[in-house]
Amino acid sequence: MDGTDALEKLTKGLSGGGGSLHQTKLLMEFQLRGLPVPALLNSSTTEQFLNTVAQLPTDLSKFIRDYRVFALVRAAYFLEPPSSIDPLEAARALGRLVDILSSQPPQNTAPAQPPTSDDTLNNCTLLKLLAHYADQIAGFKTPALPPVPPGIIGLFTCVEQMYHACFQKYWAAALPPMWILTYDPPTSPLQDWLIVAYGNKEGLLLPSGIPSEEVLAKTLVTEHHELFVSRSNSTETAVTMPVSKERALAIYRVFAKGEVVAENTPILAFTDVELSTLKPHYLFIYDFIIEALCKSYTYSCTQARLESFLSRGIDFMTDLGQYLDTATSGKQQLTHSQIKEIKYRLLSCGLSASACDVFRTVIMTLPYRPTPNLANLSTFMGMVHQLTMFGHYFYRCLGSYSPTGLAFTELQKILTRASAEQTERNPWRHPGISDIPLRWKISRALAFFVPPAPINTLQRVYAALPSQLMRAIFEISVKTTWGGAVPANLARDIDTGPNTQHISSTPPPTLKDVETYCQGLRVGDTEYDEDIVRSPLFADAFTKSHLLPILREVLENRLQKNRALFQIRWLIIFAAEAATGLIPARRPLARAYFHIMDILEERHSQDALYNLLDCIQELFTHIRQAVPDAQCPHAFLQSLFVFQFRPFVLKHQQGVTLFLDGLQTSLPPVISLANLGDKLCRLEFEYDSEGDFVRVPVAPPEQPPHVHLSHFKKTIQTIEQATREATVAMTTIAKPIYPAYIRLLQRLEYLNRLNHHILRIPFPQDALSELQETYLAAFARLTKLAADAANTCSYSLTKYFGVLFQHQLVPTAIVKKLLHFDEAKDTTEAFLQSLAQPVVQGQRQGAAGGSGVLTQKELELLNKINPQFTDAQANIPPSIKRSYSNKYDVPEVSVDWETYSRSAFEAPDDELRFVPLTLAGLRKLFVE
């Protein structure tokens, strides 16, 4: 029931007729499902409900009348999800509810307080505890631990939600008191930037003396151009290199003091200096370096520096893995301080919750192509994968952890998912990642988060409940919340008989009397002979005459659903307080009924069907005491299995179909680009150095296009960029079906548990098995297509045309030095280094076969990729050649007229002496 009018609707349902069976059904659902707290905050509505319940003749209504606080508040809940609950607002709502219940007078038909062995369920006691706890929550502030709910109110759903919400705030505020003790200026300002940006994002304290983001951004942008790869020198984008692009964008945003256009920003890179000086204990803030290495970008760093970086990273991750293993291995519970210490350790090296998600995305979108020749990269990435997976599930558990049943249920789901993701049946094994080097089971390592069940408190409440039906309802609630953490013998060693004994003045009934009475009972009867139903002979006789026959009809699936549920309810309710001999059988029957309702109402309760099998097994154990050869039919349980699993199968079939359709849709662009890249690698181009353009061979060859070299290079880069983006888009399509497949693995594991249940019911599994095969085939297809795309010519087209993207053989700087060469100061070293460059990278290996010209269709595609490609002469810049005369450019002469008083040259009056030369004289001169 949801909404603020839920209590009003329940009151109308109770007073609208339908008989005591219908009224008991409504009250049972009310006690199990609860009502929203806002629905209880109307004083008149609450009073009307209590007055209505006081007039009902059922046993459950008597309990609610006498123990109104426990009955109304125990299952009351806040509508908001746990992460959205404001503890202060919740405390105020709880305080108003306490005031309303305190103002309700005792009902006229009820005693002031029924006699009990203790005050566990006492209305006044519970109201005081609730009021006190509401005050404690209102005063709660981090970093203090949340106040512990006193007494039994810690079992109340709304109190659990408040306690849980406080713990979420407590864990979110748990940050290390000091991240970096002292500031040691690094060689490269990039490390300072990464530390400051990460610390500010995560709210970590930074050491004094470290520069601000503004200073560091200015230094990086203005003084370290080597750390940025401009768009003109890279085909990578925010799609193909999201982390590197985002890191550079953050720097430029701070530098520009505002928003900048993401497309215009470069990509953040690194040099040997960064690789050799970055500290490994901050490893995971270097996410852009790890992304680049995964995608074969080394930015001309030396092999030695790259391998040293990987080696130091592996050493650090080995130490971190050993610490985590030691801290969690074999630990059933950790203290809050120990849990915070693990969080601090992860945060200190850059493994925040958001960082774990970033790395998981990077790993999921790795290119399916050989990585650089780095010996340790596969091991390095295996450790990154394992530690980020651990961090991901650690933070998920931390965000859901509190000592409550609410947390227990959620944590079980998280750990089950972690176990499924880490299973060997998971097909995702990237070729660039080695087998997991840190061999521990994450679901076991994080099991310390699972809170222990408050067994003593649960047993105390169970013993204090005076109603057998309410005990059954409470046990159902406990089993639903705590599952296997609660022992099966919760009711043992407790007097399950009524609080008051029935005194009869007639002789005890005989077996024949009991059997005759049972034969006369009809489903739906509510009146009963108390002398008969209290007889020790009644349980066996009722089991033979009604319990087993009705169950057999239900389990053989011979009854219509509503009729079957009605008959089960009657078995649970008939003489519930008097027929004490039926209590052991009714307890599992009541749990079974509500598990069936969970399945039919699609509440998706965890393990509902498996728990139902447990209940049926326990029920037939009791039945066989009266009917030893009683067998459990399977048809109804199999139909429930199909009902529960069919929507899951259909939804996931639709998901994988959409994935395959999306994959099919994404293929044409990749194929088109791959074919075009392959064709370009087969062609022989002519280069005209005079006009700096490329002549492209086409069919027909009469007028081949002349493409300026700059436009040709731009087209090559665009093709490579488009191919990489299309490949990433193709792999990104699998993002939603990967978690879907994890859910499928969980269902398969659940099916395996069902098939190995002691009842040995053969549940149909063909649909799930076929669905798994479909997913595996889809993953295999994606892997092959992505690998093929990454190995096409177009994926690395700039590498094939690498000679066009080399630096100039004689750069402009060298030309300037040549023009201003000074023999007294300059050397020829720079010229020699420039001339030592190879003219070409090596012998080009063209693909064999294929056409030697571009078709018109391919030419149109090139023009679509870059409209300037075939714009012929219009795209060729005008020639810079000029017409020269036989005159020299004479620089302007600056004359100091104070020193030089004349404006004309006057030759000295010296006598010129000439020596006549003859041919004989010249010969004589050379001979000598």
UniProtKB/Swiss-Prot annotation:
Please state where this protein is localized.
Virion tegument; Host cytoplasm; Host nucleus; Host Golgi apparatus, Host trans-Golgi network
One GO biological process term is: virion assembly
| Matching InterPro entries | Herpes_U30, HSV_ITP
- Region (Interaction with large tegument protein) residue ranges read 482-928
A Pfam family that the UniProt record links to this protein: Herpes_U30
Alphabetic keyword roster = Host cytoplasm, Host Golgi apparatus, Host nucleus, Virion, Virion tegument
Q: Which GO terms describe its cellular component?
A: host cell Golgi apparatus; host cell nucleus; viral tegument
Residue ranges of coiled coil = none
Q: Which family does it belong to?
A: Belongs to the herpesviridae inner tegument protein family.
**What binding partners and quaternary form does the record give?**
Interacts (via C-terminus) with the large tegument protein/LTP (via N-terminus).
Role, per record: Plays an essential role in cytoplasmic secondary envelopment during viral egress. Interacts with the capsid via the large tegument protein/LTP and participates in its transport to the host trans-Golgi network (TGN) where secondary envelopment occurs. Modulates tegumentation and capsid accumulation at the viral assembly complex.
Tell me the protein's name: Inner tegument protein
Which source organism?
A: Human herpesvirus 8 type P (isolate GK18)
The organism's lineage?
Viruses, Duplodnaviria, Heunggongvirae, Peploviricota, Herviviricetes
Task: Tell me the name of the encoding gene.
Answer: ORF63
